[in-house]
UniProtKB/Swiss-Prot annotation:
The reaction(s) this protein catalyses: 4-demethyl-7-[(3S)-3-amino-3-carboxypropyl]wyosine(37) in tRNA(Phe) + S-adenosyl-L-methionine = 7-[(3S)-3-amino-3-carboxypropyl]wyosine(37) in tRNA(Phe) + S-adenosyl-L-homocysteine + H(+)
Top-level EC class as recorded in UniProt: transferase
Alphabetized UniProt keyword annotations: Methyltransferase, Phosphoprotein, S-adenosyl-L-methionine, Transferase, tRNA processing
InterPro entries, alphabetized: tRNA_yW-synthesising, tRNA_yW-synthesising-like_sf
Any single biological process term in GO: tRNA processing
Record's protein name: tRNA wybutosine-synthesizing protein 3 homolog
Residues making up the signal peptide according to the UniProt record: none
Organism, as annotated: Pongo abelii
Metabolic or biological pathway, per its Swiss-Prot or TrEMBL entry: tRNA modification; wybutosine-tRNA(Phe) biosynthesis
Similarity comment: Belongs to the TYW3 family.
SUPFAM superfamilies: SSo0622-like
Length: 258
């Protein structure tokens, strides 16, 4: 079976499976983006989360939060208010932790070139911890992600360790991150549409394709210039201030049984 046929088989199998996430469906803020990618021949999404604010109640034998072994006291993909957190905290018996988790998207790509286009767009949109993973069987995965998360312990053994004023402060920070996260998703979607339109035009005109052969490398070195029509000066400034994010491409090889 050739690579294209094998990719189509993987795509059909993945998209026919039931959604096994807790919610059981794609988050509202990324439905259009996910549908757009899945309609393209060269991509399909394997998992996604639009970003969320969580209050988790973990065990009392350590501070490391394991989402699989803890109680979800509160989860929202929208802005969160203090009263909801205070009410949820009353149910905590162990170590409650407030978290903000930014947008994450995993996309299987038909070939490395397709993944490079998505990676370049993700970097330009502010998801600077994105990376590409290549398996020995030919599976090429693109992970869109960033590092602007938040994780703060609030209680220990069921006892609240912070003031309500501090909780209010943390929620302001988390909500700001949620709003910035949404802007980045919108930038990513807009830039993606422009990039794929350019790719289509390039494929229709071979001379343009030859001229743009080094575009991915150029974008990687100069992400602030690569999608000028998608990113305003104000947005560009926000990305410059995001010092925790790292630029670059991450390519690893999975074992044979991947």
């Amino acid at each position: 079976m050739d690579r294209s046929a094998e990719f189509r088989k993987w795509k059909a199998q993945c998209l026919s499976k039931a959604d096994l996430s807790r919610k059981g469906s794609v988050d509202e803020d990324v439905v259009e983006l996910v549908q757009f990618l899945n309609m393209r021949d060269q991509f399909f999404t394997t998992s996604s989360c639009a970003g969320r604010i969580l209050l988790l109640d973990g065990g009392i034998n350590g501070f490391e939060v394991q989402k699989q072994n803890c109680c979800w006291l509160l989860v929202t993909h929208k802005l969160c208010v203090k009263d909801d957190v205070i009410v949820a905290l009353k149910k905590a018996n162990g170590d409650a932790t407030l978290k903000f988790e930014p947008f994450v998207l995993h996309v299987q790509c038909r070939q490395l070139q397709d993944a490079q286009i998505l990676h370049s767009v993700a970097i330009d949109a502010g998801f600077r911890n994105s990376g590409i993973t290549v398996g020995k069987r030919g599976k090429t995965m693109l992970a869109v992600r960033s590092t602007h998360g938040l994780e703060v312990p609030l209680s220990h053994k069921g006892k609240l360790m912070v003031t309500e004023e501090y909780i209010d402060f943390l929620l302001n920070v988390a909500n700001q991150k949620m709003e910035e996260n949404k802007k980045r998703i919108e930038r990513f979607y807009n830039c993606l549409q422009h990039a794929l339109e350019r790719e289509t035009m390039t494929n229709l005109h071979p001379k343009i394709k030859e001229k743009n052969n080094s575009s991915y490398t150029h974008k990687k070195k100069n992400p602030e210039k690569a999608c000028a029509q998608c990113i305003t000066k104000e947005n560009d400034k926000e990305l410059e201030n995001d010092d925790d994010d790292d630029l670059g491409i991450n390519v690893t090889i999975f074992p044979e049984d991947y």
